[in-house]
Amino acid sequence: MESRAYPLNLTLKEEQKEEEVEIQELEDGPIDMQKVQICSEGAWVPALFDEVAIYFSDEEWEVLTEQQKALYREVMRMNYETVLSLEFPFPKPDMINRLERDEECPNSDEWRLQGVTFAENEESDFRTPDWASPTNATSHFPQPQPFNSFGLRLPQDITELPEWTEGYPFYMAMGFPGYDLSADDLASKFQFSRGMRRSYDAGFKLMVVEYAESTNNCQAAKQFGVLEKNVRDWRKVKPQLQNAHAMRRAFRGPKNGRFALVDQRVAEYVRYMQAKGDPITREAMQLKALEIAQEMNIPEKGFKASLGWCRRMMRRYDLSLRHKVPVPQHLAEDLTEKLVTYQQSVLALRRTHDYEVAQMGNADETPICLEVPSRVTVDNQGEKPILVKTPGREKLRITAMLGVLADGRKLPPYIILRGTYIPPGKFPSGMEIRCHRYGWMTEDLMQDWLEVVWRRRTGAVPRQRGMLILNGFRCHATDSVKSSMENMNTDMVIIPGGLTSQLQVLDVVVYKPLNDSVRAQYSNWLLAGNLALSPTGNAKKPPLGLFLEWIMVAWNSISSESIVQGFRKCHISSNLEDEGDVLWEIEGELPKEPPKECGPESVAEGD
C-alpha cells in the first residue's frame, strides 16, 4: 500500500541569521500546507508547514497503540495552542480544520486543493486518519477579526468571500485561510506588504476623533478602517490637530534640541522679558544663548546660536515673531490726474532739452536711526496684540541726503548730524558731513549740497543741461534754491504731494535695502559681544564713526542695475519712442506750458 503522510505540528523551525529564505512550491503531498512567517533574531523568515511537521504512513499508524495515538493528538493540540498563545500570525491549515470537524474523505463530485483537483471517479491517496477523533470537532481558538479592524480596502471586482473558518487571520504573506481563493489568486488581485505604512492628514484624523468621541474607539476604528491604537493616539493630540493645517500628515522633528538646557534657559529669558514688557528679538535670543553656552563651557564650534537654531527653538516652545503693522500711505483721490500731469511735465522737459541719461537725477533726505528699533518681537503663538517698551534711543538719528543718477551712479552721501559742531573722530571717506542744531535739512544746507555734490557730479558739463527730481519739501522749492539750480543749468521737477512712494526712485528701490543692511550690521555688532553697558544695564550706542561706516557700506551695496530699473519704473528714463513704456502719456495732448508743479524756471531753453 502506498504511503500516506499526515501533518503533525511538533515545533517551529528557527532560521538563524537569514533575512530571506526562498520558498519552493510543493509538487507532491498535501498542497494546503500554507506559508508562515516566524521571527528569528528580529527578522521575519518564511518557512513551510511541512518543514515543521511529522508524517505517518498507514502501516506506521496502525502499529501505534491507542495510548500512543492519544498522546500524539494531545501533543498536536498543545503545540497549536502554544503557537496561538504566542500571538504568532499562524493560520490554521485547512487540513487541521477538516480533521477537527471529522470531515469525511472527499468522495463527492470534486474536491479542490491548492493547485490539485480530484475528479469524481479518480482515486485519491488522501483519507482522514484514525487519530482525528470527533472529540476535536469543537475548537476553543479565538475567532478572527473582521477586515475593517486591519484597515484593508478590498477591491470591488472580487466576489463576496465566505465567512472565516477558525484560526488566526493571517493575510499578509499567504492569503486568506479558509477561503476558496488561494494565496496566489489573492496576490494577483491586490498587493499586500507587511512593511507598508499608511499616512493620514489632520482633517481625516479629526473626523475619526469626533466620531470616536460620539461613539467609542472601537466603532471609530471599524468605521474608518484604521487601528484602534491610532484612534487613541489621535485623541491625545486633538489640540495639535485642530491648530495644524488640514493637509498636514505628521508632526516630525526632535522634541528637544541638542542642547536642551540652553533652550530651556533661553525660553525662561523670553518669559522674563515678556513679563517686563520689553521687546525680544531673535538677535537678543541668540546673544543670550551664546552667553549661556559660555557659562556652560560649551565650545564655540559646537554651538553657534545660528538663526536656524533660533527658528527651531521657537518652534519647539510655540513661539513666533510678532510684526508691527505698518501704516499704509493713503494715495490722493485725484491720483490719476496728478500722475498724468506729472508724466506730461517730465515728457515736455525731456523732449525740449533732450537730456543725457547721466544728467537726470533724483535726490532726497531720509532719517537713519542710530539704534534701529526692531519692528518684530517674539511672543507666544496666538496671543493678542501686546504693548512693548523701547530703549528710548530710537529718536537718536542722523539725516542723510542721498542722490542717484539715471545711468545707475550714486552721488556721495551728505550726512547732517544733530548738534552745533562735528564731534572729533575718524570718519569714512566718500561722504560729506555737516551739522545742524536739530539735524534737519535747511535752505542753506540745500544750497551747500548743490555746490559740493550736484555741481561736482561726474560727467557734469557747464553747458550741458540736467534735470533733478525732488519732493515737495519746503527747503527744496525756495527762490534761492531755484536760482542756484538755474545757474547750474539744471531743471527742477517737484513730485506731487502724496505720490513719492510711487514716483520717487529712492523710495522705490533704495531706502528698504539700505535700512535692512544697516539693521543687519547693527545686529552683527550686538552678537559679536564685548559691549559697553550703561549704568542701567543696557548696551551703549555704537560709536559715531562705526555707524557712519555702516551707512557707507549699505550705500555701496545698492546695485547700479536696481537704480536704472527704478528710473524706468518711475517712467523718468523711458524711451521716448517706445509708447508702451510711457504709462500716462496722452497722445496729442502735451501741454504747451509747463504745469504748476514744475515752475516756469524749469523749462528754460538750453543754450
Swiss-Prot record:
It holds the Pfam family DDE_1. Its main location: nucleus. SUPFAM superfamilies: Homeodomain-like, KRAB domain (Kruppel-associated box). GO terms for cellular component: nucleoplasm. Residues 8-29 form a coiled coil. GO terms for biological process: regulation of DNA-templated transcription. CDD domains: KRAB_A-box (cd07765). Disulfide bonds: none annotated. Residues 47-118 form the KRAB domain. There is a cross-link at K13, K384 (Glycyl lysine isopeptide (Lys-Gly) (interchain with G-Cter in SUMO2)). Residues 250-323 form the HTH CENPB-type domain. It is found in: Nucleus. Residues 588-607 are annotated as: Disordered. Residues 589-599 have a biased composition (Basic and acidic residues). This is Pogo transposable element with KRAB domain. It comes from Mus musculus. The gene is Pogk.
